[in-house]
């Protein structure tokens, strides 16, 4: 259901861009989705995207290969030693504080996030952005949030997240975000718990 819905978003955005001759970016992360997952079960919608677009052979993560450092590296284009988010949990000696992805106060503290993520750059240029659970967007980094953002809540169904993104792309031009970043915690959570080749992980894929 998830992969079918995400494919629908991409098709809808393509139609929107064609109709209005404008540029939009949707960045989707399915955490822990290994490159070879596309080959261990049927993924017809990903196959369509691969056939009509492009598919890489893999992705080399930054070290350490954890969720928060890598997602923030994607957003900033920086290595972890430069943007400062060096792990999911760590002690920041310069701030004399402990950071944890499970601690709401630190997650929302912009002082932990170095560099300039893409949504901050865009907002400063007058380009509206939106995020559904992307790492870093809950903090006011350099005093800036995305125009639309959500506090992380893993219990929010994937379908609800997708519906929200579709709604954002349907907003009036003056309020419509041109960059949207969407995060799903699967298949990472299931893959860690049951293993990458388990039937439960395959079901998530």
For each feature predicted by the language model, list its residue ranges.
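Sec-dependent signal peptide recognition
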Residues: 2-10
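A generic structural signal for short
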Residues: 10, 34-35, 59, 106-107, ...
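Hydrophobic h-region of N-terminal signal peptides that target proteins for export
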Residues: 10-19
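Beta-strand elements within well-structured catalytic alpha/beta cores of enzymes
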Residues: 22-34, 49-50, 74, 122, ...
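Short N-terminal helix/helix-N-cap motif within the alpha/beta-hydrolase-1
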Residues: 37-38, 192
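Short, structured active-site-proximal loop/turn typified by the sulfatase FGly-forming signature C/S-X-P-X-R
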Residues: 39-83
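His/Asp/Glu-rich, glycine-adjacent segments
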Residues: 79-204
